[in-house]
Amino acid sequence: MDVSQTIVLALIQGLSEFLPISSSAHLILVPKLTNWTDQGLIFDVVVHMGTLSAVIFYYQAMIRSLFFDFYYSIIKRQIIGQSKLAWGVLLGTIPIGLVGMIFKDFVAVDLRSIEIIAYTTLVFGLLLGFASWFNHKNKNPKSTISWIDVSFVSMMQILALIPGTSRSGITITACMLVGLSRKLSIQFSFLLSIPVITLSLILMLIDLYHQTQLVNVSLLVLGFVISTISAYATIIFVIRLIDMVGMTPFVIYRLILGVFLFFL
């Protein structure tokens, strides 16, 4: 890897992790379109650490509050403050974690074709558009999440294992389909990313333990810094943009990208 490849791939990870356009799809497509060599597992670990750091830093106050509400809900055995949201984040991670571990090799080898990415980009782009329209028509969106909502969103999140789906895209879609407000949909989706990214990091570190790779520390540091800053900026941008215009720009982008991929 050289500096230009490091910058581009770190930016892609940082920008696309929290945009509903699929970071994994773009990280697969760019090297294929540019004929770059594989960036290596160590680089993947580092840029994922960057995006994880960004979302934790952005939501640090809420995470602290959720942690204490979660803790006291266990002690007192009742819902305390936003403990239901905290439990939702925890329980909502279990399905994708289990399925991801069981089918890890299948996903990594058999679901990375451009054709599959093209289909998922289009199909889930259309679903995102429908969910956005449904949310716009919903005059009484829910400001709290129920256990049924958590169950539905967590099941839908499993689809994010397929490249091109977008974890943030499918979870925001699911949240809006069950009637959650746009604000809560984004919030729950981004909070769900914390344990999901953490789990993927653990799996990558396990794989990394069995490998021997030469590393360029300066490029890894550069990748971490760029992915962290770009991810943090993206979180701010996405929240403001969706609040103003909804999901339309992302739906249009996904449809254009999906059609383009079919001609490759």
UniProtKB/Swiss-Prot annotation:
Q: Which UniProt keywords apply?
A: Antibiotic resistance, Cell inner membrane, Cell membrane, Cell shape, Cell wall biogenesis/degradation, Hydrolase, Membrane, Peptidoglycan synthesis, Transmembrane, Transmembrane helix
Q: Looking at the keywords, is Hydrolase present?
A: yes
Where does it primarily localize?
membrane
Do you know which InterPro entries this protein is assigned to?
UppP
Record flagged with keyword RNA-binding: no
- Compartments where located: Cell inner membrane
Query: Would you identify the family this protein belongs to, as annotated?
Result: Belongs to the UppP family.
Query: Per its database record, what is this protein's job?
Result: Catalyzes the dephosphorylation of undecaprenyl diphosphate (UPP). Confers resistance to bacitracin.
- HAMAP family registered for this protein in UniProt: Undec_diphosphatase
Q: What is this protein called?
A: Undecaprenyl-diphosphatase
Originating organism: Vesicomyosocius okutanii subsp. Calyptogena okutanii (strain HA)
